[in-house]
Structures are given as structure tokens and as C-alpha cells.
Amino acid sequence: DFSGNVTRAMRAIDGTIVLVCASEGIMPQTETVMKQALRERVKPILFINKVDRMIKELKLTPSAMQERFLKIIDHFNILIEQIAEPEFRGKWKVNVADGSVIFGSARDNWALSVGFMKKKNIGFKEIISLYDGTMSDDERKKWIWEKAPLYEVLLDSVVKHLPSPVEAQKYRIPKIWQGDKESQFGKDLIECNKNGEVAFVITNTIIDPRSGKEINAGRLFSGTIKEGMEVYLNNEKKKQRIQQVLVYNGIKPESVGEVPAGNVLAITGVV
């Protein structure tokens, strides 16, 4: 049960990729996570994962696979219709044609969307042929890396369909923050103003195994965080000085001088 982690993470993000198993469909835990996301006004896109199982284990025909995909997509959109607020229902439903639905195998590191298939001139026939025994593992990996790499398809879809912080904070702040929206601070939050007062929400704290220091990760909604700057801790009712400002390159934290509003980052020196 990751619901506590999910709740904290929802404050730090504006969009999410929802993974659904192609064989099992949308499970109750996935529905719970979708409810949390939609109630926080976090926009979802759909990744139908483990398509390789449908080919290798279930040995489904292309038409049977298509039927399974459509059932998952319909279920996903029904949940959006039931849970999302009226202003987002129509805009946030996913469909295959615009690339907000992705198919793939995270384990085998490939993915496809309609737009990507057109760009690369490939289809599911080529994917099915990957598992017919005519290719070695090295040949399959080479084909995937050249033709349908997971990272490229996912990132293309994220850039195209998920909102920027500047766009998202306009409709998310009124939902997740109960302060005065007409105050200067409220306007800074809504506008994602990098020159405004610092508003950093810590969503996770870990201990660096090398240094033993606490690393506090979270979302910067307003202002610019800089190394050495003094910040006010709202819960502790005291001021402390930031030692390091970090951004993550994959899972590796890298020190930077400063980070503006709208980013996910980490800091040290604040306990």
C-alpha cells in the first residue's frame, strides 16, 4: 500500500503516467491512485504495460489485443468521467489517436504510440515479430533501441500532453492551497512566479548514505531557492539556512547554484 507516498507525491507533480497491465487491466489499487490524482487536479496519461505477455504467453491475435486495449481505455476514461471535475473531464480523457495512450513493455524497454508509429513507419506486426524466435536477444535489443525506445515515446507523450508548471498552477493552486488567492503571495503561487516569495513543499526526506545528511525533496511553487539563503520553516516556526540545492539526474542528485519556481528539487541543511 503506497497511498501515503502517493498522497505526498501528488503535491509535487502536475501530471502522471498511469501504468496498467495489458493482461489484468485496471486493478482496484490503480483506481485508488487515479482518484487521488484527479482530486488533486493532476492530469493522467495512460501506459498499457506488459504487452509482451499478450504476445508471448497469451498468444493473442492482433484483433484480440486491440479488443483488450479498447476495454482498458474505455475503463480509464469512465473513471475520469466519474471522478474528475466537470471542467477537466472532456479535456483529460485519453485516446489512441492523439498519443495520450502508450503501449509497451517496460521490462523489454520498448513503447509505441500512434504518432510515433507514423513517424518511424512501424506497427504491431514488427513488435510481434520480435517474439517469434527469429531474432537473438542482442538483435532484438538493437532493433528496440533504434526503432521504439521506451524513453523516447514516453517523453514525447509527456511533453505533448502533460502541463507545464506555469499552466498547471493556475488551476491547481486554488484546489490545494486554502490561503488568500488575491494576496501577493497567492498571486505568486498561481503565476509560478520565480521572483516571488519562496514556497517550497517538502514531500520526502531521505538520509544520504554517503554523508549521513538529510536530503529534503519537494516542489518549489514560488520564488527561487539558492544555496546559502535563509528560509522560514512554517511547521517549526523558525529560520534556517540552506546548504545545498540539488536536482536529480535520474536517481543521482547533482548540486546546482539555484532553482526557480515550478521545479522538483532537493535541499540540505534544513531539518
For each feature predicted by the language model, list its residue ranges.
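Structural and coupling elements of P-loop NTPases
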Residues: D1-V271
